[in-house]
Amino acid sequence: MNTKLLYRLARNLRFYKKDLIIVIISLLSVSLALLLIGNVFRNLVDQGLVLDRTAAVDKSILYICLLIIILSIASFFRSYFINNVAEKVSSQIRKEAYSNLINYEITEFEELKIGDIISRLTSDIDQISKLIVNFLSFFIRNSVMLVGSIILMFFESFKLASIVIITIPLLLIPIIKFGKHVKALSKKTLESQSLLASDINESFSNIKTIHAFGGQAAKITEFNNLLQDYLTYSAARLKIRALFFAFSMAFIFLGVTLVIWIGALDIVKGNLSSGQIISFIYYAIIAGFSSGGIFELLSEMHLPLAALERIVTIIDKSPIVHNNYSDLKPVNSISLEFKNVNFSYPSRPNLKILNNISFKIDSTQFIGIVGRSGSGKSTLMQLLLRFYVQESGIILVNNQDIALLNPNEIRKLIAYVPQEASIFSGTIKSNIMFGNDSSEEEITEIIKITGIADFTDKIPDGINAKIGEKGVRLSGGQKQRIALARALLRKPQILLLDEAMNALDSQSEQKLLSSIRDIMKGKIVISIAHRISSIESADNILIIDKGAVEAEGTHAHLLKTSDLYRTIYKEVDLL
């Protein structure tokens, strides 16, 4: 058993001391009531049945009824409070894990699968809840009852109790033998469960593509293979646990049978009374079930402990914190500059994306960026947002190196609209307001400017309409208008548009661009364009090729001087 992990869990439990005290008192009450019933059985037999005393029988039955009432009440408090604590602790751990995960550096998510994250934050934490209930409730209760029943057995018969004591340590053999295998299989089971979650998430996120390409059969086969892996590991783990439990129970009750045989011989010889052997058998059965329950829980704990370990790795992996950031100096006009910047993605270190790129953008400029796919256009925005760190070179905002500035302060200056509009489940209004604290008047104005009012006026509930997960009820153009409204409502100093209007027709795009330029006067707009027509009016256009600026200038200038620009223009805009 991993005591370090249990200690980590105990740190979360310390906040619920009052509840745990009630749980412990309830557990002790349950255990004591069950153990006292054995003593009442002895009196019932020896004083009531053997001596034929009706009063003794009635008194014993009354005691048993009272103990059952105590047992029931204590069981209620135990069950309610331990499950309540388990839910609270699980929620607390889930909150810690989520809060830590969402603050990870973007690079960390290149190594994580969304399905794995979902699995850890849901099913793994549910396993932790089971661990709390099983350990604090059943494990402690069984331990108290085992110790208590053994002590009482010694009071009844030292010889018979000694036989029971000898058998219990022998059960450690299968625990040691099977434990390592169960632990390894538990980890494999959780990993295969995460792969299943990842596949489900991937499949239904791309359900339209699967249908369009007739890929249902292939995806079903892939899912079934993953499911078979999960079932294989799960079945192997359950088989070992079942063998262990069967061995344990057989061993325990063979021991109880041996005790009954020897005890019966002692009754014949007059060394034990009938009440003593009945009481002893009762305690022996309690000891048998308690020890069997303990060993069953020990074999079962490997799965929740493996789940706890997977969650702890998320919580313990602290985001990078810097306390020596420089303050961002306020200036009247914003400026931006890349100086000899080189970059490769961490997952593809041998593939150069940006190659010694340099350019400067002054305030009030509308900058267009064009280039072939994979030339590094979007990467420029990723670096400016500090999602990644360049290998060499300097990126300056207001003549300050952004490597020395707090990334959150830089992001406050920027509004970013990616190629695929990021839409959250909720309403149109909640999506527009995401990250913004704006008045109703500002929201009303921005939905008019971005053309959102054109379709919200025609639907029930307007901007308060529910749009489904990832905006499934919206068209591509509607999603992009919402993403643009969110960005403009932020009132940024720098607006980054990464093919942000490619789902709109040319006329709508031009109208929206005109509105954006009016709103962003005196600020910087950088637009990566698929259609050159959308940036023809830009103050300056950068042509990115193989990670460097191949040429720059106005649309008219580049048409005259750049072969690459003319080629792209003909390929895209004149088709």
UniProtKB/Swiss-Prot annotation:
One of its GO terms (cellular component) is plasma membrane. SMART domains: AAA (SM00382). The keyword Cell membrane applies. It is an enzyme of class 7 (translocase). The keyword Transmembrane helix applies. ATP binds at residues 371-378. Part of an ABC transporter complex. Transmembrane domains (TMD) form a pore in the inner membrane and the ATP-binding domain (NBD) is responsible for energy generation. This is Putative export ATP-binding/permease protein RBE_0492.
